Amino acid sequence: MSELSSLFIKMAEKWQAKWAEARVYEPEPRPGAAKFFVTAAYPYPNGAIHIGHGRTYLIADVLARFHRHMGRVVLFPMGFHYTGTPILTIAEAIASGDATVIEEYMAIYGVPKDEIEKMGNPLYLARYFHEQSKRAMQKFGLGIDWTREFTTIDPEYQRFIQWQFEKLRERGLIVRGRHPVGWCPRHSMPVGAHDTKDDKEPEIGQWTLIYFADGEGLVFPAATLRPETVLGVTNMWINPDAEYAVIEHNGRKMVVSKDAAFRLSFQGDVRILREARGREFVGRSVQNPVTGEWVPVYEAKFVDPKVGTGVVMSVPAHAPYDYAALRDLNAVRLIPLIRVEGYGDYPAKEVVERMGIKSQTDPALEEATREVYSAEYTKGVMREDVVGRVGAHLSEPARSMLRAVFKMYFAGRPVREAREFISKWLVEAGIGGVMYDIMNKPVYCRCGTEIVVKVLEDQWFINYGEGRWKELARKLVEEMAIVPPEAKAHFLATIDWLDKRACARTRGLGTPLPWSDGWVIESLSDSTIYMAFYTVIKRIRQFGIKPEQLIKEFWDYVFLGVGTPEEVAKRTGVPPEQLKAIREEFDFWYPLDSRNSGKDLIPNHLTFFIFNHVAIFPREKWPRQIVANGWVLREGEKMSKSKRNVLPLDKAVDMYGPDPLRATLAITAEVEQDLDFRHAEAIRNAQQLMSIYSLAQRLAQTAEDRSPNWLDKWLVSEIALVLERAREAYEKVRVRQAAVEVLYNAKSVFDQYLASVERPSKLAVEAARAWAVAMEPIAPHLAEEIWSILGGEGLVVKAPWPQLRPDPVALLAKRYVDMVIDDVKRIPAFGEGVKRVVIYVNPNYAWVKAALSGDVKAVINAGAPPQAAKRVVDIVKTLGDELRGLISAVGKFDEAEALASYKNYMEKALGAPMEIYNADDPSAPDLGSKKKVALPLRPGIYIEK
């Protein structure tokens, strides 16, 4: 802990105590008042929260604090997610003596050895990190209402979740059946993103299997994502060095890689008959089940036994890897299948040659493959003549009948339609099948086991594939605010592909499924509408309502308004006035105004949040906004336990102090961007905050009570502009932009002001107090300290947003004065030995107003000589939008008065005495004939040496 961080920590402790004493963050509903209800994703207490969590929570906290300044009643609560396997997996690892996990927890999280020994108990581990994370949030200065805190294994919460699931079941959205799921072979249970290392969502894809067979009936099931190309197969590929197995699967003897046999065993009965190296099968001939053609099996070391079945069909006309490999073997035979605009008959050959690819090991083949596959899928059409290749091995009339089917549904069709047709037809014809796989492999369970796909027979699912439900979800996405806006497309895409999702398992902490013993609701399914629970748990506890009283009728009334307090009281035993109070509390806070989380939760939690809200709640209670922030890196690298570069939030607060840490997480990247947290940047921000503190102390000690001058008015006007830009940034959730305005741009204005005046005025103190309010969402402890030393009443956290108004005359005067200073400095005669600077001002400001139109005649009509009129128009054209806007807003402007008011400021900037004259004053001396060249905004300047 440095001296600087120690100062900020002590400052924070002081003001956090005062906030707690004033119960600032424990709001009560105020009927009729505007409100702002924000939540951020509650953490799993399977470890200490880190600066990545801190960033998400900071953004929510910044919004909460800003909206409080805007006069709204603000609620920002927090809970803890005990459900699922993350906690259980770590506890099991510690209990089994896993040295790696134990060492990580001691080194990264600073857990003492005597505490580690107790963490084999999952609830002890969860409570330990629950309390540690809560302390970290408090030290970080998050304005959380802890009176609403809960865990997801609290009995009240479990009753709430059971009600939610009964509602989904009533609406036909929970089903039981057969479906592929991500699966941990070790724990024998479905897994989702929160059950995996690095929270990686298992992406389940489907291979089409095409059953090529040799003369002995041994099937070689080629796994492909492009079954429409089966008509162009010229050979098969097998890795000669890989381990393969002959298996019995679905009544067939098949050759697949040993790894594929293991994966297939979770999708049907698999019996391994024998194992062999791939080279045993090289050189055989197998028959294409669609064309009847016999093709050879070649060896290829590029075949990955962990992908598909380890058996690959080769289509060199349309697959760059196949073309390059066969070219190396001098065995190329091309069969054209797909017409693509901009390509010839053989797209793979064309692209390989265009890119100068020389061999099958060239890395550029990856790019070539992407180009060909994308072009064929998006623009490709199946050739009409492919029909002639179908069923050559069949006798009549079967051959003609099959070709007629292909002519109708395959030939001349877009590739995507042909693919859909042939995928179904192969299975229906019994010459193909389906294999599911993890397409973003490897994905590992938190226990370290690689995830596979299992087809479950009697699993409970939430049916996110239901069409009407998807439409409601899309409607909400289109209506609500999403930050960043470009994430809206990601949500819509997720809604499109979401299908049935396993919602219960037989292992882990959590809520029992209410209608089926032995099942526990999984962690991404019990965390979709808990924001509503925050609004009622405080009263449930306050009134002493028991979990067994929280029956269906209670929740129906509180959340949906079903029934009357009197009717529900009879069923629950809860007094009517208490029921009414709880209902009113929910009604005041809901809908949720902002849901904050990391962008990695868009494909799961955040989209489930949307689905479940539209399923459970009426439209007026649907959430209004989602904020999905980017990740946090550390010194350019992803944080991970294996790299030992995870920075726990409480440790970061101790290293830098809460406000410097908040400033760094706010200012380093805009919300949607990934943030690279760097030590040097955090130190720089700490020093910037310290300089702001020193500036405020100087103001408090030196400000004098005097009539405001032009510089004072300019300061207030500039700060008013900074605050307005900050307000707009906060409103739009542009947290970095707001932080730049309040921590750097405002400081720069004050620095310039203090460098230009002998002593600051009381008006400057008022401006600094306004600045403290705008700074408070980012650096609340420093803002309180500044507010206090500058005489602010009460706590700045409760202060209304300042109403400073910019004075356009004061702003124009300062811009004009600085422009004149620059003009003087650009004159070649300016430099060493200047005795005085004489300035001649043209008083015809009306010419400048007229010149805004860009019309020379308008300036002449305002009284300017023609030659001068053209020059004034040219001058005005060079001005920026801001200066033109000020000129438009200011009716009259006296350049001589502005220069005279800033005389001391200008003489200090120029390092020489200055004299000011009106150019039309006949008594003024005409030094260097500069009077006649003076124009509005461009005075005549004489330099005497």
Swiss-Prot record:
Cell compartment(s), UniProt: Cytoplasm
GO cellular component: cytoplasm
Motif ('KMSKS' region): 638-642
Keyword Aminoacyl-tRNA synthetase: yes
UniProt entry keywords in alphabetical sequence: Aminoacyl-tRNA synthetase, ATP-binding, Cytoplasm, Ligase, Nucleotide-binding, Protein biosynthesis
Positions of short motif 'HIGH' region: 43-53
Gene3D superfamilies named in the record: Class I aminoacyl-tRNA synthetases (RS), HUPs, Isoleucyl-tRNA Synthetase, Domain 1, leucyl-tRNA synthetase, Valyl/Leucyl/Isoleucyl-tRNA synthetase, editing domain
GO MF annotations, alphabetized: aminoacyl-tRNA deacylase activity; ATP binding; leucine-tRNA ligase activity
One GO process term, biological-process aspect: leucyl-tRNA aminoacylation
Organism superkingdom: Archaea
Record keyword S-adenosyl-L-methionine present: no
Protein name: Leucine--tRNA ligase
Main localization category: cytoplasm
Cysteine disulfide links: none
Residues that, per the record, bind ATP: 641
Entries under Pfam families matching the protein: Anticodon_1 (PF08264), tRNA-synt_1 (PF00133), tRNA-synt_1g (PF09334)
InterPro entries noted in UniProt: aa-tRNA-synth_I_CS, aa-tRNA-synth_Ia, Leu-tRNA-lgase_arc, Leu-tRNA-synth_Ia_arc/euk, M/V/L/I-tRNA-synth_anticd-bd, Methionyl/Leucyl_tRNA_Synth, Rossmann-like_a/b/a_fold, tRNAsynth_Ia_anticodon-bd
Gene encoding the protein: leuS
